[in-house]
Amino acid sequence: MPIPILHCDRNSKELYSRFLQGAREDLTTATDRILPILESVRTQGDQALFSYTEMFDGIKLSQLTIDPKKIKTNVDEKTKEAFLRAKSNIEAFHMEQKRESWSKVIDGNRLGVKYTPIPSLAVYAPGGKALYPSSVLMGIIPAKIAGVPSIQLITPPQKDGIPEILVWLAQIMDIDRIVTVGGAQGIAAAAYGTESVPKSEFIVGPGNAYVAAAKSYLSGQGLIGIESPAGPSEVCIIADENANPKWIACDMLSQAEHGEDSSAILLTTDLTLAKRVSEELEIAFSERPKRLQMKQTAIYENSSILVFPTLDDCIWFSNELAPEHLEIQTKDYESVFAKIEHAGSVFLGPYSPVAMGDYISGTNHILPTARGSRIYSSLGVDTFLKRVTFQEVTKESLENLYPFVKLMSELEGLDEEHGTSVKVRTRQFQ
């Protein structure tokens, strides 16, 4: 059952029905299941967290938080070297995003912006097979650069304790505490706060449908901020006849490895390349059978190769799709990139697979999905900063601008108090 190869143009109805409806996860069922959990944590606090941890994780905890500085770790040196290299690159990239407060005189008044960090952050790290220590770096580093003063790591407990790599990362990133609670109850603890778990104003990090549902619901209630709403992982690849079909197949499968709901879409004008990529996918399935059923489901059911008449058509569709990850594997990839408007993160040229950004290059891998990059950006320093605008109006400027305030406030029917609050400061009133 090879991957579907579809011949398309801008008027193809299937493009809209199949690809442009948005692939955001339907969290209705998950939300229904987690609402009682959220309410229990809100009303019962620590007691609910102990109970749910024993129920879902099979672990009876004696405490809910630990100080990472008090735990000895034995992470091997090669692993440390890899994560320290990633940490260095991520820090260097995100340092370029730092903001400076500013002010400027406009029409006689000093106006400006003061940047202040959010007061607190929780970073969620899933447990078990879905352990993503790289996401811990991606969430914490830009927050640290932004100046967030309080950061806690939330992760489900394991039968043999918290994974050493997470503890070590918490140590080198100077995290306040590790909260040993996972799932929706862990998200609720961060949003509401309990006797042992301080409330956080913002939370980031990957998780299953129940974690996503809890984040979405609690954010909608105004209880905690989140990064862009999450959906299944996705990659879009724009490629021409110069691209390597084996490399493209590998890049598509690297997304399929995330889960059967992941998607990988190749956009090309070259039918020969399309067929060769399809063949390379089948070869890869036979050569690398690990997680075979999951990868095949993602490729056969959620992925496609789309053949368009022109490269501009491929670019147009990519902008409509607004993918989480976009690879551009064309001869003149810079000219293609110049026309890209919507993508979470872009990978330019044949030697820039998504996995480089996932781990080591330095860009952030916490990205908007399901066409979210049309309105959201990747996680960054700005995510954790607030803009406080200010103005200092001079006496002379107030005198000069009062007639305009008077006219505008009268027009809106608010002159009695709005207009008066300016008028009483003018010479004619005094």
From Swiss-Prot:
GO molecular function, a single term: zinc ion binding
Necessary cofactors: Zn(2+)
Co-factor binding comment: Binds 1 zinc ion per subunit.
Annotated SUPFAM superfamilies: ALDH-like
A Pfam family assignment: Histidinol_dh
EC number: 1.1.1.23
Pathway as given in its UniProt record: Amino-acid biosynthesis; L-histidine biosynthesis; L-histidine from 5-phospho-alpha-D-ribose 1-diphosphate: step 9/9
InterPro entries on file: Ald_DH/histidinol_DH, Histidinol_DH_CS, Histidinol_DH_monofunct, Hstdl_DH
Positions of Zn(2+) binding: Q255, H258, D358, H418
Residues the record lists as binding NAD(+): Y124, Q185, N208
Annotated keywords: Amino-acid biosynthesis, Histidine biosynthesis, Metal-binding, NAD, Oxidoreductase, Zinc
Positions that bind substrate: S233, Q255, H258, H325, D358, E412, H418
Any one of the GO BP annotations: L-histidine biosynthetic process
Reaction equation(s) it catalyzes: L-histidinol + 2 NAD(+) + H2O = L-histidine + 2 NADH + 3 H(+)
Any one annotated GO CC term: cytosol
Domain of life of the native organism: Bacteria
Active site: E324, H325
Functional note: Catalyzes the sequential NAD-dependent oxidations of L-histidinol to L-histidinaldehyde and then to L-histidine.
HAMAP family: HisD
Family under the similarity heading: Belongs to the histidinol dehydrogenase family.
Descriptive protein name: Histidinol dehydrogenase
